[in-house]
Amino acid sequence: MDPYQASKETEKICRLAPVIPVLVVHESGIAKPLAEALISGGLPVLEVTLRTQSALKVISEMAKVPGGVVGAGTITKSIDVKDAINAGANFAVSPGSTDDILETCAQQNLPILPGAATSTEIMRLFDLGYSVQKFFPAEAI
């Protein structure tokens, strides 16, 4: 998937909900009911950060809930991309945008919401073809 197509797919995902909850879930047992509650409340797009040991299991459980679109957040290495796909993630979110992560997502046909914090990073991603980006961290630098 080229950057243009990745951005088109990511844009479609982003348009499904007014906000995308960023979830840090420590217990996989609550994953399915949490996803069901969020989806029934009008938030079908869920980002599960890869910051806990249970994150991949959480993605796997949430991906089973009808009507949900589950992404893996805090992607920092190419192996994270592969693990996220194996867990059932529909998209990836990265806090930064290394060539390795972008190339792996492209090779694996996984839409990515690449992170950028500076104007240089944003311009570089635009030059590569990524028109949909995550401003991260969303605070004063």
Residues of each region from the PLM?
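Conserved anion-binding
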Residues: 54, 79, 85-141
